[in-house]
Amino acid sequence: MGRLHSKGKGISSSALPYRRTAPSWLKISSQDVDETICKFAKKGLTPSQIGVILRDSHGIAQVKSVTGSKILRILKAHGLAPEIPEDLYHLIKKAVSIRKHLERFRKDKDSKFRLILVESRIHRLARYYKKTKKLPPVWKYESTTASTLVA
């Protein structure tokens, strides 16, 4: 499947391990992993940042193989999940930074065009998240209030 607003095909991906069980050399329990995830979430890290830290410094390649549930589900169980999904949050952040750039450089036509593309992606994702009930049905992206969502 190709990218939405570019020519890229997106064929690169990491290979998942064949076995879906925790490795035998991993001596950490699922409760310890839960506590670690909650500790990082309280520091303000996103679920993907938590996964990178667990992979790089704790040796946990897949949280689901150790605990039986994914990082976001663990965060939801403890009430620490972000109110806006992470990919939508980063798109809003990108749109805010492009708008800030356009305030300084009003004639930057390419940035205006890219802002239109980013905002159309935001609307498309928001429609999907409303349909799957991850966002409230009255949630709406507005460029004027977007900086408060990101800050």
Curated annotation (Swiss-Prot):
Cystine pairs: none
Gene responsible for this protein: RPS13
Protein name: Small ribosomal subunit protein uS15
GO MF annotation list: small ribosomal subunit rRNA binding; structural constituent of ribosome
CDD domains found in the cross-reference section: Ribosomal_S15p_S13e
One Pfam family, short name: Ribosomal_S15
Gene Ontology CC terms: cytosolic small ribosomal subunit; nucleolus
Sequence similarity: Belongs to the universal ribosomal protein uS15 family.
GO biological-process terms attached to the record: translation
UniProt keyword terms in alphabetical order: Ribonucleoprotein, Ribosomal protein
Organism: Pisum sativum
